[in-house]
C-alpha cells in the first residue's frame, strides 16, 4: 500500500503561502529543513479546513507530513476516512480558495448584499459557525430578516460527500446554505 497524506496542503501564516505537502516533503533535505523552521517558529502552519495549528510530524518510516496537534478539535480531514480522490479534491478546494477569482467573488457577493434591504451582519471569511466540536468558516455570512445565510464558493471539483457534509452541518444549525459552483455538472455527479 502506498503512502497517502490526509493533509495535502497547509497554510503558513508567516509567509501567507499555501504549502504543498508533496513539494515540501519531496526530499529528505527539504523535509527536515521545514521541520527545522517549524521548531524554530519560522513558519506557522495551519489547516486549510479547520484553521487549527498543524505540526510537522514523522511516520515510523521517517516520512514527514502535516498533522493536527494533540487534542485538536474536530476537523473533517482528521475525523473522516477520505478516499485518495476525495483528499485530492479537497486539496484543490483549498488551493482554489486562495485564488484571485475566489476572493473577487466573495467580495462581490458581500458588496451586493450591502445594497439589499433587510441584510446585515455581513462577514467575509472571518466568521466561524460551531456545532459541538465541529466548526465551519463560510466564504460569506450574513443575516437576512433574522435568518442566517452562508455562501460557499467552489471553483474546482468537489465530491458530493463534501457537499452533503456542509449541507448537513448548516441544516443542523438552522443556517441557509447557498452554493456558488463553477462549471458543476449536477447530472454527472
Locations of regions flagged by a protein language model:
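Nuclease-adjacent, charged terminal/linker segments that flank catalytic cores
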Residues: 1-104, 111
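Short, contiguous strand/loop micro-motifs
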Residues: 96-97, 151-154
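Short amphipathic alpha-helical segments
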Residues: 101-105, 159-162
Amino acid at each position: 500500500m502506498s503512502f497517502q497524506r490526509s493533509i495535502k496542503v497547509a497554510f503558513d501564516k508567516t509567509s501567507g503561502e499555501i504549502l504543498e505537502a508533496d513539494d515540501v516533503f519531496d526530499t529528505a533535505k527539504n523535509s527536515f529543513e521545514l521541520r527545522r523552521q517549524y521548531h524554530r517558529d519560522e513558519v506557522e502552519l495551519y489547516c486549510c479546513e479547520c484553521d487549527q495549528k498543524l505540526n510537522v510530524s514523522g511516520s515510523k518510516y521517517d516520512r514527514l507530513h502535516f498533522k493536527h496537534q494533540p487534542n485538536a478539535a474536530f476537523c473533517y480531514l482528521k475525523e473522516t476516512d477520505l478516499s485518495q480522490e476525495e483528499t485530492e479534491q479537497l486539496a484543490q478546494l483549498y488551493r482554489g480558495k486562495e485564488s484571485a477569482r475566489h476572493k473577487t467573488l466573495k467580495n462581490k457577493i458581500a458588496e451586493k448584499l450591502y445594497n439589499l434591504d433587510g441584510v446585515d451582519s455581513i462577514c467575509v471569511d472571518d466568521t466561524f459557525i460551531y456545532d459541538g466540536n465541529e466548526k465551519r468558516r463560510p466564504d460569506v455570512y450574513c443575516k437576512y430578516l433574522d435568518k442566517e445565510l452562508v455562501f460557499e464558493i467552489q471553483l474546482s471539483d468537489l465530491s458530493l460527500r463534501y457537499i452533503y457534509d456542509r449541507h448537513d452541518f448548516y441544516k443542523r444549525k438552522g443556517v441557509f446554505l447557498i452554493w456558488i459552483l463553477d462549471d458543476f455538472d449536477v447530472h454527472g455527479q
